């Protein structure tokens, strides 16, 4: 049984016991910027588990730009979230009850969960499966540098970008969880790295902490002019998280045999009408360039390759990462909005509860 509570713009949160499962449901598909109108708070009973199933309690949620794509009713690499269903999200959870021989109560796992306190998961199924956290790895590490964002940076740059020593790498969305790691891996591979980010604080962090050679502040600078200035010999790899006018500006400065890694297009996700594509795609032809998109789910069989390499770089201090941690179940809808307004600094996470 599900009970929903709404009071104008406010949500009425009630005291709950262990028998109640709080949820945030997708109430309406977004048209433009995501807002409170897209979600509804609900309460339901904690589900029972069947054979080979595991009941988990969600401790921490991941917020990722691609969640906007899961909310719209169009074909994608995952089915859209249904209206009236809990919103999908990556999570670190604790096993509460298990009918599966490989999982025991108390263990921490990473999975594709939802915006709710409790969930039933089936090991071996779902986009990400159900994976135990490696020893010594915290929930925030598992959902940031060692999770989807870190693996996206690693495989996108290494497999599609194929960096070579001495090349110039341009990164949009450079202060984000993925972009900041892309730039640091590129530096480790002997490349010169130029980032594009928004705001003085983020730009300073990228040069002073993450080791970028230069950063363009799109909020206060002419991006096209600054790309030309900071990439006088053009760029060899453009790792694009933003799309839109930034992609078009970058394509004017592609080097011979340059590679564009299409990771995301956050500047267009909340558009109310289709955004026009770049008008200068012929630059790929004249420069024999390559533009390729990718989905991290295709690389999951190689996940440990990325995790082991990233763990080593973090342990040695060669890679740093930032986490923007929100707290409180009631703050979930407001937290996802931070991604699309540029308020977050680093990987956006939200803590629901501590492990028991």
Please give the residue ranges for each predicted region.
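Mid-domain Rossmann-like dinucleotide-binding core that forms the NAD(H)/NADP(H) cofactor-binding site
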Residues: 143-221
């Amino acid at each position: 049984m599900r009970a929903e509570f709404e009071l104008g713009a406010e949500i009425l949160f009630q005291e709950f016991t262990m028998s109640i499962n709080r949820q945030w449901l997708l109430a309406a598909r977004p048209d433009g910027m995501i807002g409170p109108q897209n979600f509804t708070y609900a309460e339901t009973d904690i589900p029972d588990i069947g054979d080979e199933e595991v009941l988990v309690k969600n401790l921490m949620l991941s917020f990722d730009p691609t969640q906007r794509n899961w909310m719209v009713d169009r074909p994608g690499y995952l089915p859209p979230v249904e209206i009236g269903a809990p919103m999908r999200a990556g999570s670190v959870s604790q096993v509460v009850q298990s009918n599966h021989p490989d999982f025991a109560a108390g263990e921490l796992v990473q999975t594709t969960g939802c915006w709710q306190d409790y969930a039933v998961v089936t090991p071996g199924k779902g986009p990400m499966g159900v994976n135990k956290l490696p020893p010594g790895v915290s929930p925030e590490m598992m959902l940031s540098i060692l999770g989807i964002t870190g693996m996206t940076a690693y495989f996108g740059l290494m497999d599609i970008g194929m960096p070579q020593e001495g090349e110039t790498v341009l990164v949009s969305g450079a202060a984000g969880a993925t972009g900041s790691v892309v730039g640091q891996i590129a530096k480790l591979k002997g490349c010169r790295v130029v980032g594009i980010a928004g705001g003085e604080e983020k730009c300073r962090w990228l040069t002073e902490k993450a080791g970028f050679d230069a950063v363009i502040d799109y909020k206060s600078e002419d991006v096209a002019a600054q790309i030309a200035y900071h990439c006088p010999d053009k760029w060899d790899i453009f790792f694009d998280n933003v799309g839109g006018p930034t992609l078009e500006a970058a394509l004017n400065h592609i080097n011979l045999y340059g590679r564009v890694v299409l990771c995301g297009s956050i500047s267009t996700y909340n558009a109310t009408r289709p955004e026009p594509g770049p008008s200068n795609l012929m630059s790929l032809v004249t420069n024999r360039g390559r533009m390729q998109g990718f989905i991290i789910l295709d690389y999951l069989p190689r996940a440990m390759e990325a995790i082991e390499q990233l763990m080593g770089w973090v342990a040695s201090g060669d890679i740093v990462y930032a986490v923007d941690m929100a707290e409180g179940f009631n703050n979930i809808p407001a937290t996802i909005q931070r991604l699309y307004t540029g308020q977050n600094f680093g990987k956006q996470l939200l803590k629901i509860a501590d492990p028991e």
